[in-house]
Amino acid sequence: MKKVTSLKKRSDNCKIVKRKGCLRIINKLNPKFKQKQG
């Protein structure tokens, strides 16, 4: 999981999700693309 200041989709399968007031990117096909903001 990378912590970043600006989220960017690294592939078309990435989805932006808001959990507990923090934005995340999840990708079920390629889990190494996970990102978190905040």
From Swiss-Prot:
It holds the Pfam family Ribosomal_L36. It comes from the Bacteria. InterPro entries: Ribosomal_bL36 (IPR000473), Ribosomal_bL36_sp (IPR035977). One of its GO terms (cellular component) is ribosome. SUPFAM superfamilies: Ribosomal protein L36. Keywords: Ribonucleoprotein, Ribosomal protein. GO terms for molecular function: structural constituent of ribosome. One of its GO terms (biological process) is translation. Belongs to the bacterial ribosomal protein bL36 family. This is Large ribosomal subunit protein bL36.
